[in-house]
Amino acid sequence: PNYQRSDGLKAARLLKAGGLQLDPWQMDIMDDWLGLTPAGKWASTTCGGSVPRQNGKTLLLQSRATAGMLLYGEEVIYTAHLQKTATETFEELREFFEHPKIIKHVKEVKTALGREQIILKNGARIKFLARTRNGGRGQHGDLLIIDEAQEIDENAQASFLPAISASLNPQTIYTGTPP
């Protein structure tokens, strides 16, 4: 994408404070995903990535979500094909937010199955949802993450995309594993 500046380095510093380190290829993608126009809007409102299993895709998504929450106060909707995957991602991200240098930003963590959320003091939040035909109804946010995008169907996509339509600076990220 063509962007004037990127907050990728800010995001990397933030992650490092919480004990996470991005690989160079992840940093390149993060720079693109966090690329901004002169007006401060996302240079890419729809992004994607196809990453083989066990190569750092989840860390990349967690990093983008974390940057959105801490740097921009975003409301994030993370979706996965299965609730098991959504819950596993929640557990990993909760661990990051429990880091001694990061926990001061946390207001509340909700752990009820299927309703997991991390809410920050700045108003940012992330919800972890399984994609269902009606799973996106009534949701709202700024960043929509479609993990396991190779498994999404038209009904689930139609359910979730309106969730970010009211955002002043929406972004949708599709990632998956090659077949």
Residue ranges and their predicted role:
Residues P1-P179:
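Phosphate/NTP-binding elements of NTP-utilizing enzymes
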